[in-house]
Amino acid sequence: MKVVIIGGVAGGATAAARIRRLDEQAEIVVFERSGFISYANCGLPYYIGGAIEDENDLTLQTPESFWRRFRVKMNVHHEATAIHPDSKTVTVKNLENGKILTESYDKLVLSPGAKPIKPGFDGIDSDKIFTLRTVEDTLRLKKYTDEHHPKSAVVVGGGFIGIEVAENLRELGIDVTLVEAADQLMAPFDRDMASFIHAEIRKNSIHLMLDTKVEGFADTDCGIDVKLKSAPTLHTDMVVMAIGVAPETTLAKDTGIELGIKGSIVVNDKMETSIPIKPPPTTTADFG
């Protein structure tokens, strides 16, 4: 049996390891668009602030170590661009040299993950605006702070990532403003619990702006302006957007796989998508 997995970060790498434990003979091939596999996003902000000092500590495995341990072929910088259920093949682009290849499969696992939400605000594509989802995002943000030595930063979004980014930028001595559209940080928390978070944020000299919505951005000669709906414009050296993520399901949608109302992939109790698995012509399947 040959299994192709699209996505090699947390879910994809875990699936590959589990499949290997269940089947020692299976051929397992993973395609990952980024240059890194098997990492947890939770630790990324702490590389920015220096709590994690070594870049290599951000990842649990490399393609080489994964092959040695599990005999799974990890292809980084490879993006799956099309799925062909009728022929049971996947079209893949090598992002390093632009070559296109076709990979066959018996079973296909989708683990595309999520992407940061970036609203269509004016100025959203500024090179002074960052997101933090991948190792590449982290290295880009770290490079910017190391080379440009920003004195101020605005973090938009008061969830886990936003708070952790604000904490770690503050550790660098940066003057940080945390902007949240709701009337509290950490929406899943009760208001009385969130109040403790608010107090801790302020205790660490982070400016907290609640009930404040961002409307757009504008580059300036010496930084970037953050336009707010109900408050004066903030001038800062850099911005980190951390207002949540959305399912990365463009490939699934293009394939005709059913999606839910929020864009995630619909599956049954066996984690199968709306496109059934077709048995090879030489076998007999029992659907009873």
Predicted features and spans:
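Nucleotide donor/acceptor-binding cores
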Residues: 1, 26, 107, 127, ...
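Beta1-alpha1 glycine-rich phosphate/pyrophosphate-binding loop at the start
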Residues: 1-75, 166-189
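Short hydrophobic core segments
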Residues: 6, 103-113, 156, 234-244
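Rossmann-like dinucleotide-binding cores of NAD(P)H-dependent redox enzymes
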Residues: 59, 139, 152-153, 160-217
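A conserved beta-strand/loop element that lines the FAD pocket in flavoprotein oxidoreductases
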Residues: 69-84, 204-214
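Conserved beta-strand-loop-beta-strand element in the redox core of flavoprotein oxidoreductases
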Residues: 84-102, 218-233
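Glycine-rich dinucleotide-binding loop and its adjacent helix/turn
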Residues: 110-172, 207, 267-269
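FAD-site-proximal beta/loop scaffold in flavoenzymes
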Residues: 125-149, 222-227, 233-288
